[in-house]
Structure formats: C-alpha cells, structure tokens
From Swiss-Prot:
Short name of one Pfam family: RHH_1
Superkingdom per UniProt: Bacteria
InterPro entries, per database record: Arc_rbn_hlx_hlx, CopG, Ribbon_hlx_hlx
Name of protein: Putative antitoxin VapB19
Protein purpose: Antitoxin component of a type II toxin-antitoxin (TA) system. Upon expression in M.smegmatis neutralizes the effect of cognate toxin VapC19.
Record organism: Mycobacterium tuberculosis (strain ATCC 25618 / H37Rv)
C-alpha cells in the first residue's frame, strides 16, 4: 500500500542522513520505525536490539551529562524559535 506523508525540513534531513549512513531507502527506514514504534516484536528481537547497541558510547570524548546538556540546549533553542519557550 502506498501513502503520502508530509515531513518538515528537519525530519527530512534526519531521514536522509540515516538513509545515507545505513544504505536503506527512506521508505525502508520509515517502515522500520513504524514497526519499532507500533509493531509487536518478539522478546528475542528486543533483546537482540539491546545487545546490538552495547558499547555504542565507547570512544566518545564527552560524558553522558555533557550530551544531555547539549541536547537540552538544542531543544531550548528550537522551542524559543517556535515561540514555545
């Protein structure tokens, strides 16, 4: 089935970066995201995903606190631009 979805510039840029990094199409990434968000993946699939993410912070030159602060800063800037802060 085919459907049409309107994305903002930021969402499209995120999707394009993920597509380039993974080699998957936009459509495939959207299908995967829908499956993760709304699907009924098995316990084994969820555990495999957790196992796959192990060590993802290895080699980073910043702490978790610094990362969260940076994200919050970006969020606050976006909210201010939208007049929501």
């Amino acid at each position: 089935m085919r459907t049409q979805v309107t994305l903002g510039k930021e969402e499209l840029e995120l999707l394009d970066r993920a597509a380039k990094a993974s080699g998957a199409s936009r459509s495939e990434l959207i299908r995967r995201a829908i499956h993760r968000a709304y699907g009924t993946g098995s316990k084994q699939e969820r555990l495999a995903a957790l196992d796959h993410s192990r060590g993802s912070w290895r080699g980073r030159d910043f702490t978790g606190t610094e990362y969260v602060d940076a994200i919050r800063g970006d969020l606050n800037e976006r909210l201010a631009r939208l007049g929501l802060a």
